[in-house]
Amino acid sequence: MKFCKVVAIMNITDYNVLHEPIQRLDVPGVTVSMVKGFGDYVNNFSPFGFSDNMKLEIYTTEEQAETIAAELSSLADQLTEGGGVVAIEPVHQLMNVRKLDD
C-alpha cells in the first residue's frame, strides 16, 4: 500500500471552513500547525510581509489523498482572500510509533 501526505496551507481564520469536510471524509488523523508566510496575500503591516497561517498535514493512502486534496481545493470560494495551497507529497515509509502496554 502506498502512502501520501496531504499538506494544506491556509489562512488561520479558515479552520472552521475546513473542519467539517475533514471530519466528513473520515481522515485517519490531522496535524495542525501555526505558521507564518506570504503568497498571494502580503501583510504590509508585519515584518517581511508575513501573515498568520495554518498548515494541515494528513497522512493517508494514495487513493484517499486525491479525494482529500480535491475536497480541500473545492472550498476555495469559501476561504479568506488569498486562499492557500494544497499539495500531495509521496511518503517513502510510514511507521506508527507508540508505546505498547505490557
Language model regions located:
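Positively charged, small/polar-rich N-terminal and surface patches that mediate targeting and assembly
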Residues: 1-102
